[in-house]
Amino acid sequence: MPKPPVVVVFDMDETLGSFGQLGILKDVIESYEDRHLTQDEFNRIIDKHPEFIRPGILEILEFVVGQRNKKLCDSIMIYTNNQGPRSWAQSISEYFSYKIGTPVFDHIVAAFMVNGHRVEPSRTSHEKIYNDFIRCARLPSTTEVCFVDDVEHPRMIHDNVYYVKIKPYHYRLPISHCLERIYPSDSDRQLECLSRAQARFHPNSLRGDEKTPEEQEVDKVIGRFMLKHMHDFFLGLKRTHGKTKRKYSYRSRRRTRHL
């Protein structure tokens, strides 16, 4: 009997990183420049704001890509309810490919609907549902899934799912500070972009909410535990699919892991 496919699936917002203010910056800069940013320009903006990326996530993605290279993982995917255009999730995906140095995500399952328009035809609901995911990704029902999300979705709890529920990652910098990083020697651009941001967005979304050293350490610890659970997932698969007789059933011991 062939082994079932193995996929690792990540939520996007507050799981891979904190991208709300990144969206504001992209919107404001594109308005100022009167053009769309290139992927390289988008990448440079994130590189100037490493706080937007969850601590430890690059190491986690490198590990999972390594498992895929060893043929122990068939696909790495994003399953998101983000209400932006599909191109937004694609830009985030391509940033991680740039950082890792190789394509990371094989497929993106986008939101059910955005602004009243159907985006992902094979989804049946805004809920994240195991059967919807399998259908959208065109996978067999035997697929083994490691699913990482900062929200507990009851209908993603399934015998085939190793569910890692993590603490949401938030990091907000004052937009004025972000613009100083992007245009360090051009105060006119800083002021014009800030003015556009103030005209378009609620004041609270432009304020900073920087973390204490203790909070930052908690985020690093969560990143280390996420990586440990990735190791545990693949170790469990080896025990389940190995040729030697199992001493216990990996699947029967599954439950949602809370971090």
Task: Name each model feature, range by range.
Residues 1-117:
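Alpha-helical substrate-recognition element adjacent to the catalytic core
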